[in-house]
C-alpha cells in the first residue's frame, strides 16, 4: 500500500494554531511572566516561590517527596532547589543518603511573608486576564490531572 503524502501546510497550520502543547505552553509563559514580574522585587521568581511554598507545606519532606508533590523530574527539582539552598531560604537536615529532610529556614519564612502580597497581586491579575470561565477551566483541569 502506498503511503499518503503529508500536506505540510496543513500540519504547520495545525501546529501553529491548534496544537495543545504550544497553546498551553504559551499560556504558561504569559502567566509565569505575570507572577515573575510581581515577585521580582523580592528576589524570587514564580517557580522558586511555588517550590518554597510546597517545601513549607510538606515541612521536612525529602527531595523525592517534594518532586512528586510538584510534579517535577529530579534534574529540574535539583536545579531549582539548589537556588533555594544557596540563598539560605531552605536547609537540608542530616539524614541518610538522599533521604535528607528539607525545611524552610527563618530567612525563607521571612521571604514568604514579604512576597505573599505580591503573589496575591499576581493571582488577581491572572484571574482578570483569564476570566471566570478560564480560571474555572484551569483549576478543573489541574485537579483532574492531579488524580492521574
For each predicted feature, which ranges?
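Short capping segments at the starts of secondary-structure elements
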Residues: 58-62
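N-terminal leader segment of winged-helix/HTH proteins
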Residues: 1-42, 110, 140, 144-147
Amino acid at each position: 500500500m502506498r503511503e499518503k503524502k503529508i500536506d505540510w501546510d496543513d500540519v504547520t497550520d495545525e501546529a501553529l494554531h491548534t496544537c495543545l502543547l504550544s497553546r498551553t505552553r504559551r499560556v504558561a509563559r504569559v502567566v509565569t511572566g505575570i507572577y515573575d514580574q510581581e515577585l521580582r522585587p523580592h528576589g524570587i521568581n514564580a517557580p522558586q516561590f511555588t517550590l518554597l511554598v510546597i517545601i513549607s507545606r510538606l515541612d521536612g519532606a525529602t527531595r523525592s517527596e517534594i518532586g512528586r508533590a510538584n510534579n517535577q523530574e529530579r534534574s529540574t527539582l535539583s536545579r531549582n532547589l539548589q537556588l533555594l539552598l544557596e540563598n539560605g531560604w531552605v536547609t537540608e537536615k542530616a539524614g541518610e543518603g538522599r533521604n535528607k529532610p528539607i525545611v524552610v529556614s527563618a530567612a525563607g519564612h521571612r521571604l514568604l511573608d514579604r512576597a505573599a502580597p505580591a503573589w496575591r497581586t499576581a493571582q488577581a491579575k491572572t484571574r482578570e486576564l483569564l476570566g471566570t470561565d478560564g480560571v474555572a477551566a484551569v483549576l478543573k483541569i489541574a485537579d483532574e490531572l492531579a488524580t492521574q
